[in-house]
């Protein structure tokens, strides 16, 4: 559990008016699950603290060689729970949060993947993730006056999903069991189970 005391007076639903706040990780995750903008001072301060913590540990992970057992230990520190013994990850690995990544059994993540997981990233059993894949669970407002606001939404991969190198999975996307994302795709919408998608934006190429 993370308890980060902010320096700002209350101006959101998580605390009482006029009081200083201590936001917990559970507070943040519950708020992010609503999809509301992450734009209050309390939330921004909490995100900064969590980003600093995640980057400190990922620096240790990426700075030198580690055995897979050591990699899993550091990832467990980043994610806040003991990751499965069947997880294999080739560093470098990047995240600016880390506490909302959920990984099943027999998952493989290749080098240089980026997890922006504030909205939640779930990888089902047997997923294979290629080089340089980006999971982006935050989006910005379209209107210029709202563009500084970020809005969270989860990304969910079912079982046995294969994501090719240099793909980007955007917020709110669910990819069904056994599907394949071709290299370089930008996935903006849900992917049905047992399909291959590719392109920018990604579209169904064939059924498996």
Task: Walk through the language-model features, giving the residues of each.
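Short arginine-rich
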Residues: 137, 189-194
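Terminal amphipathic alpha-helical/low-complexity segments used for targeting or macromolecular assembly
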Residues: 1-86, 202-205
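Extended beta-solenoid/beta-helix repeat architectures
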Residues: 173-176, 191
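A generic "structured core" feature
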Residues: 162, 180-182, 186, 194
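Flexible, glycine/small-residue-enriched loop-and-beta-strand segment within the central core
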Residues: 93-103, 108-174, 200-208
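Conserved active-site beta-strand element of glycosyltransferases/polysaccharide synthases
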Residues: 197
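Short alpha-helix at the nucleotide-sugar/activated-sugar donor binding site of glycosyltransferases
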Residues: 128, 179-180
């Amino acid at each position: 559990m993370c308890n980060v005391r902010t320096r700002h007076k209350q101006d959101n639903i998580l605390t009482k008016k006029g009081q200083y706040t201590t936001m917990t990780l559970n507070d943040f995750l519950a708020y992010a699950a609503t999809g509301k903008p992450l734009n209050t001072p309390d939330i921004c301060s909490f995100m900064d603290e969590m980003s600093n913590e995640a980057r400190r540990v990922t620096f240790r992970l990426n700075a030198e060689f580690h055995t897979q057992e050591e990699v899993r230990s550091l990832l467990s520190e980043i994610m806040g729970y003991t990751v499965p013994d069947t997880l294999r990850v080739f560093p470098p690995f990047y995240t600016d949060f880390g506490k909302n990544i959920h990984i099943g059994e027999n998952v493989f993540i290749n080098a240089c993947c980026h997890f922006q997981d504030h909205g939640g990233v779930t990888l089902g059993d047997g997923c294979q993730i290629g080089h340089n894949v980006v999971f982006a669970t935050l989006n910005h407002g379209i209107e210029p006056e709202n563009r500084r606001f970020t809005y969270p939404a989860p990304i969910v991969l079912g079982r046995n999903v294969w994501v090719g190198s240099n793909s980007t999975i955007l917020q709110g996307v669910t990819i069904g069991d056994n599907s394949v994302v071709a290299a370089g795709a930008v996935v903006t919408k849900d992917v049905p189970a047992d399909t291959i998608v590719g392109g920018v934006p990604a579209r169904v190429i064939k059924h498996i």
